[in-house]
Amino acid sequence: MWGYLSLMPVFLAVWAISGVWIVFAIAVTNRTVDLSKGFPYISICGSFPPQSCIFSQVLNMGAALAAWICIVRYHQLRDWGVRRWPNQLILWTGLLCALGTSVVGNFQEKNQRPTHLAGAFLAFILGNVYFWLQLLLWRLKRLPQPGAAWIGPLRLGLCSVCTILIVAMIVLHACSLRSVSAACEWVVAMLLFALFGLLAVDFSALESCTLCVQPWPSLSPPPASPISLPVQL
């Protein structure tokens, strides 16, 4: 039985993948990118209006969803007995990935290139590290794996391809092979969105989540007076 929490990763994957390709289609249609000169980076497609507005909205909402998914995943791993420090390391890696995604969307390359590249580093590199850490934890701790037996190997394959393509993207860009490097960037983005989408399988084991407010002890209300209840023996 799949609960509503399992829909969040699926929605994130569908939203982000369709959103960036819509931005690409608009950029090609209004000729802000010219395919005859080479295949563009995602950031180039989202640098010019009107698609830059859509690009920002897509990545901002995607970042918010990714952050919430990382928080839910943190609590799931905690309930599975994962210790605090590795769990928090995974959580903060995911949150920084979400932050980088928002930075990429709001600081376009043509306006704030250094800030944009810093956001891209957080989104791509730490996004990949986020899933590698979970794979390592799953391997060492023998954590539960909801879903089919091939989910784990599939994640391993996607993370491996993602790592190879990130390295290739950087090397090809340094060698001025921009079109091939851009193609690698697109594939990496799709793989990361797919990896987030696969968390739907893990969340299928969750029925719901509850937000609890924990006040400081000094601000807690005084305990209620004890009440004696008659007991008949």
From Swiss-Prot:
- Report the protein's function: Modulator of macroautophagy that causes accumulation of autophagosomes under basal conditions and enhances autophagic flux. Represses cell death and promotes long-term clonogenic survival of cells grown in the absence of glucose in a macroautophagy-independent manner. May have some role in extracellular matrix engulfment or growth factor receptor recycling, both of which can modulate cell survival.
> Which terms are listed as keywords in the entry?
Autophagy, Cell membrane, Cytoplasmic vesicle, Endosome, Glycoprotein, Membrane, Transmembrane, Transmembrane helix
Topology relative to the lipid bilayer, per the entry, is:
Multi-pass membrane protein
Identify the residue ranges that face the Cytoplasmic compartment according to the record: 1-7, 73-84, 138-155, 207-233
Tell me which InterPro entries the record gives: DRAM/TMEM150_Autophagy_Mod (IPR050911), Frag1/DRAM/Sfk1 (IPR019402)
Any one of the GO CC terms: plasma membrane
- Name the glycosylated positions: N30
Family in the record: Belongs to the DRAM/TMEM150 family.
Query: Which compartments does it reside in?
Result: Cell membrane; Endosome membrane; Cytoplasmic vesicle, Autophagosome membrane
GO:BP terms for this protein?
Answer: autophagy
Chain segments annotated as transmembrane = 8-28, 52-72, 85-105, 117-137, 156-176, 186-206
| Expression sites by tissue | Highly expressed in the colon and lung with comparatively high levels also detectable in the lymph nodes, placenta, duodenum, peripheral blood mononuclear cells and spleen.
User: Which parts of the chain does the record assign to the membrane side Extracellular?
Assistant: 29-51, 106-116, 177-185
What do we know about what induces or represses this protein's expression?
Answer: Is not markedly up- or down-regulated by DNA damage, nutrient deprivation or by exposure to TNF-alpha and IFN-gamma.
What's the domain of life for this entry? Answer: Eukaryota
Q: What is this protein called?
A: Modulator of macroautophagy TMEM150B
State whether keyword Repressor applies: no
Q: What is its main location?
A: membrane
